[in-house]
């Protein structure tokens, strides 16, 4: 009989895990502090934005939750994701795609707004009863490059609908920065939101002040944070952003978590670091905690430490800033076309692992996208790169003038890697 029931469930696209009771998630106010509770137990979010590195690795490193940005179009894939999260003891902040004005959505179009609400109702009802669901995230950075405040009325209507359809899970929206004017709009137009998601990068240290001056006294989750953003980093003289090396990023993540995120147990419910995987955004390494090849970086080690209080038994290599022609990126390195040059990266591995150095050169990106919109990886430069296997490199500068970027990955053979890159410009002799 049990076997026949399992077969019937699978035929309906439902797994046994999905048939378990939905999680009961509440935000309570206790002794002057907000507390997120899952099935009655306190739940401090130790999470990441998920982008391909996998729930198993997140759980192994001490994480307990991940967030998504939408529910996608393949129901079977979403249910498989929920099931996998449940197997690893993880909860998911389920992202719901909501039209952004910067992408052309018109909140004066009542028919489009109604159709969006109907579509979201269907999505919520598909997944609301899965035990891995933690909460709903209505849209992402809807305040980025927008002008029509009706978007917040739509968020309010979506929130009200979700509360009716799914009383078991809180609802929030995420904000790309915030101030009193924005918080006042949310209070007036979407008052039923249970909490807000805050997304800050290099300026996350200002979060306590922003909370105070904006008038937001309710609970929040830091739904995106991480390295210093490309828009707030130093620039070369030709406006190429300077990216921190992997070791510096790990140091900043640990510092920002300990000083800002972990420090607020009054309003803060935890965070989702960006990004558990990799993506191209100005460079292929700027935001991902993993390299495209799947290797974990020092940032992953840092997150394991702040989540668990212990470092992993084998850690990623440590690197110093990359030098080209004896200079670092902030010195706006300019080379002469066709001339020979040398680059150097200093690396140390605390475990004594043998190191492999991988060098690549790309054209500098011309992308100007915002808000994480899709970018293509710039084309590689067809040029001979002569590494010495010890962190040194020799090459002849490209013959064509323009903007380029030199990359190096330092792999330890244990599934970990550090990296650095340096933008440079080539001029005619």
Identify the residue ranges that each predicted region occupies.
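Aromatic- and acid-rich polysaccharide-binding/catalytic face
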Residues: 177-231, 235-236
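Short, surface-exposed loop/turn segments at beta-strand-coil junctions that are enriched for proline
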Residues: 396-401, 414
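Bacterial N-terminal signal peptides
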Residues: 7-16
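Active-site mouth of glycoside hydrolases
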Residues: 28-30, 37-193, 206, 216, ...
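C-terminal edge beta-strand
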Residues: 420-427
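Substrate-binding clefts and catalytic carboxylate motifs of secreted carbohydrate-active enzymes
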Residues: 30, 38, 45, 212-374, ...
